[in-house]
From Swiss-Prot:
The keyword Calcium does not apply. It comes from Bombina orientalis. InterPro entries: Bombinin. The modification Asparagine amide is found at N27. This is Bombinin-like peptide 2.
Amino acid sequence: GIGSAILSAGKSALKGLAKGLAEHFAN
C-alpha cells in the first residue's frame, strides 16, 4: 500500500543521506 511505499522511500532516502554524510566526513 501507500504506507509501505512511503516507508520504503524513506528508508532509501535515509540510507542515501547517511552514505553522503559518511563520505563527507571521511574526506
